[in-house]
Amino acid sequence: MEKPNATVAVIGAGDYIGGAVAKRFAAGGFHVYAGRRNGDHLKGLYDEIAAAGGHCTGRSLDARKEEDVAAFLKEADEIAPLEVCVFNIGGNVNNPLLDTTERVFRKVWEMACYAGFLTGREAARQMLPRGKGSIFFTGATASLRGGNGYAAFASAKFGLRAVAQSMARELGPKNVHVAHLVIDAGVDTAWVRERRGGDAANLPPDTLMNPTSIAETYWQLHHQPRDAWTFELDLRPFGETW
């Protein structure tokens, strides 16, 4: 594959949605600059993308630290122009209200909302001088509904959605596409399968969301013509109740 002429930064490049997004954009010719809390866990992603002929580098990143996020996205832009930035940090916790400590509430907010603000702002700093780019935020069911035991997580995801809305209204006229993707169902991960019974053979097909299928939507969003941009969409399996 030829040397990429654009970079996608994936903040929260974990083993499922983040990794799948990285692989999809690498297959499309982008250099992937991947960040996650423990950079040692990125080796498998590097190897898989390289084996497919793509380009991927990255490092450890604390997305709650302003200077770290700014440096990370500047580094991404120095590899090749930063064209896409994906914020994919979760922070999902489920605690009864009276068991939710100040520390937990603050940490979840820092991870799922404040880090998204930092990411969006610093990505915009790199994109606005060129007058183009895409900034995508991964949301959840909790972005729209505060469930029982999800006071910390839902408040942070509500906040992230508001940050994304505000950014979209400000940056859209400057040719930067901001979108918020509501992942409104269980993603096919080992943790989710364990909660639903453990044995994959016992689960009906296509009732959990395949990260590869989700990643395809990020790819399609980036290639939307700007006369018909999507700000928000929700994704769920065909049989999901909603």
Question: Where in the sequence are the language-model features?
Answer:
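C-terminal helical subdomain
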Residues: P173-A185, A200-W242
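A short, exposed helix-loop element centered on a Lys and neighboring polar residues
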Residues: G120-R121, Q165
